Amino acid sequence: MDRRRFLLGSAVGTAALASGLGLSACSQPAAVPGAGAPGLVTLDPVIEELQERSFRWFWDTTNASNGMTPDRWPTPSFASVAAIGDALAVWPIGVERGWITRDQARERTLTTIRFLHDLKQGPEPTGVGGYKGFFYHFLDMNTGHRFGQTELSSVDTALLIGGMMFAARWFDQDHADEAEIRRLTQVIYERIEWPWLEARPNRISMGWHPESGIIEADWNVYNEGMIVLILAMGSPTHPVSKGVWDEWCSVYDKSFTDRWGPKHLHFGPMFGHQYSHMFI
């Protein structure tokens, strides 16, 4: 298997990508004495209910005709491409838990990925869903076109791709629709022009606006943007160099502080860990 195509084989696997691209870890985790493989967990009924209700939110609020998942609810909302990526990862879980059938999940997944594949892209500020393979952060729930003046987002595109890859890995049968899910996922991933957003050496920008150009802020400190770097380096068509990883790691120690007591991350929100590590 091509070292970059492995991404479809294991969602977004950091270890395999790091090995294939010659990356080094930013730091080495400390060994935990007596640590072993986790055993089976029996969940509290409250947690079970929370999980199913969370699943039902995605299933019930997503536009079944095109796969657009709203950014919020119950107020009228636009779709979030990151939320769409989450939804694509949720459908297989729903099958595994017995909440929907594989046929239902397959149909919803293919509808979504096909809609995004066919969605018009271009430099125009309106009437398109993305540009150079990237998608706008927020899309109209019905047309899939850019909502308002939202940015073309590198991280939200990456989270969408993460969900697509999870789905492409899970739908592994010979069924024609499952093969199409895998094919379209690869096409969408391969057309993203990652180097275009490397406006500054070894740094990938957070995005672009057709009105003002590339955003000045970059993914260069520890936060939810790790998945952007992994996907960009692993691209089989438009890769960036491993210098973006070296730059990321060069400020790793500065991501921590002991200013207010025990050493901790400057960037503390839970999503800073969850968003990338759902897939990595």
Spell out what each predicted region is.
Residues M1, L21-Q51:
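C-terminal segment of N-terminal export signals and the immediately downstream linker at the start
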